[in-house]
């Protein structure tokens, strides 16, 4: 089930209730739409909460979403670089994770302009969210894998009806 993007609505709700944990709880009490639950509920941490992030110091998250997963990564890893095509998603994420000083937010266009040596082979973990069905999956995986360090891991997170949890390691 594909959720509608409600970034601007979430930003309005943050203005009204706040973006801290207390404010988010108030938002969830006041607005029970599935889109709001999807965007703000910390239950979504279950997607990766079970994973061991030992040795995953430098993380690249491709696809910001609203920031629930970013918060989990920021708690467990040394640095998280979040890349998204939508500025408003980065703003929502940044407001949700304002307490973390180890997260940097990068617009996708700026990330693409970075020199290859600045990003290829630099990340211990790449978290790839795929909500762009128009892109070729082989191209997406090849590009994401190029950012991994030699022993890096790639996590591919997508909406799926069966709830599979898969993780891939870089193969030589």
Predicted segments with their positions:
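Conserved SAM-binding loop
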Residues: 93-94
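Conserved SAM-binding loop of SAM-dependent methyltransferases across substrates and taxa
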Residues: 66-77
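A short glycine-rich, Lys/Arg-flanked "PGG" loop and its adjoining helix->strand segment in the class I
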Residues: 138-153
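A short acidic, Gly/Pro-enriched loop at the edge of an enzyme's catalytic core
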Residues: 115-126
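Conserved class I S-adenosyl-L-methionine
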Residues: 55-65, 156-172
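Conserved alpha-helix/loop element of class I SAM-dependent methyltransferases that forms part
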Residues: 38-57
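N-terminal auxiliary segments of SAM/dcSAM-dependent transferases
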Residues: 1-18
């Amino acid at each position: 089930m594909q959720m509608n993007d409600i970034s601007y609505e979430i930003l309005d709700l943050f203005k009204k209730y706040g973006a801290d944990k207390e404010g988010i709880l108030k938002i969830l009490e006041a607005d029970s739409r599935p889109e709001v639950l999807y965007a703000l509920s910390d239950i979504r941490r279950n997607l990766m909460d079970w994973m061991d992030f030992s040795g995953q110091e430098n993380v690249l998250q491709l696809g910001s979403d609203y920031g629930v997963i970013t918060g989990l990564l920021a708690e467990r890893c040394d640095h998280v670089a979040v890349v998204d095509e939508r500025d408003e998603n980065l703003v929502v994420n940044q407001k949700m994770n304002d307490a973390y000083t180890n997260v940097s937010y990068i617009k996708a266009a700026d990330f693409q302009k970075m020199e290859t040596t600045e990003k290829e082979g630099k990340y211990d973990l790449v978290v790839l969210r795929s909500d762009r069905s128009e892109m070729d999956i082989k191209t997406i995986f090849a590009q994401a894998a190029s950012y991994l360090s030699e022993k890096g891991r790639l996590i591919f997170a997508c909406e799926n009806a069966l709830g599979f949890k898969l993780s891939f390691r870089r193969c030589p």
